[in-house]
Amino acid sequence: MVVFSAASDSEKPGDAMSGADKGEEEYRKPAIPVANLNLAKSLRTLDAPEEFPEVIPLNVGGTYFTTRLSTLRRYEDTMLAAMFSGRHHIPRDAEGRYFIDRDGTYFGDILNFLREGELPQRDRVRAVHREAQYYAIGPLLENLEDTQPLTGEKVRQAFLDLLPYYKENLERIVEIAKLRAMQRKARFAKLKICVYKEEMPITPYERPLFNSLRFERSESEAKLFEHHCEVDVSFGPWEAVADVYDLLHCIVSDLAERGISADQQCIGVCDKHLINHYYCKRPIYEFKITWW
């Protein structure tokens, strides 16, 4: 910063030019930086590992917790152990608590597992599992995945993996139902959905002309029965013990998980004529999707 001051009484008029030259020379000199001692001290502090007290006060999304440092460091490969390793800066709230910007509703369950291996109650398992994924607590994830309802979900998913377009079909159900309800300005929409386990159609009219088992049919025979039922969405076929009613339960449950109310009932079979006396006997279900 350049400071200008009035000439003193002792300066002579003849010195005005020399004074101006001197001022210009001073103006051209580069400013000398002044060391910021506080900034230098702050940088040195960040370079050194942060030290923590034995008892740690926490603020997790506005919910307060207190635990031992050793509890947070119990498993090395976790987010909490890394946070409190001293290698990272952790912000504090106005009262000095270490702040974690995460909903603290289930953080107590996380601490209970870190303290003594305690698992949450069944109705909290899914939510705690999500938190365990966020904090990367592998041992807790393994324990929860062997607990209901996550164990049942793994078995259910093994069945759904047999239907490669299950998720896409579920999205199609939602989109069609939404579009129809909006077009009709209606509270609900109805869809026709075909759910069949066996690919081979049957007929009540005569003795089957072809082999009834799919793996015994020739390729030419199979092509005679290829067709698309006149429905909105079709699921099947699959090879598993789980039957049509199991898949219907999965569809309704997954829609409910998204907050969508769905009722279904069988309204008959496709009954489309294929060849000779053969008609498609795949069951057709009417789904009623209620939006409000």
From Swiss-Prot:
CDD domains: BTB_POZ_KCTD7. It is found in: Cell membrane; Cytoplasm, Cytosol. Residues 56-144 form the BTB domain. It comes from the Eukaryota. The keyword 4Fe-4S does not apply. One of its GO terms (cellular component) is plasma membrane. Keywords: Cell membrane, Cytoplasm, Membrane. The keyword Cytoplasm applies. Its main location: membrane. InterPro entries: BTB/POZ_dom (IPR000210), SKP1/BTB/POZ_sf (IPR011333), T1-type_BTB (IPR003131). GO terms for biological process: membrane hyperpolarization; protein homooligomerization. Residues 1-27 are annotated as: Disordered. PANTHER family: BTB_POZ DOMAIN-CONTAINING PROTEIN KCTD7, POTASSIUM CHANNEL TETRAMERIZATION DOMAIN-CONTAINING. This is BTB/POZ domain-containing protein KCTD7. The lineage of its organism: Eukaryota, Metazoa, Chordata, Craniata, Vertebrata.
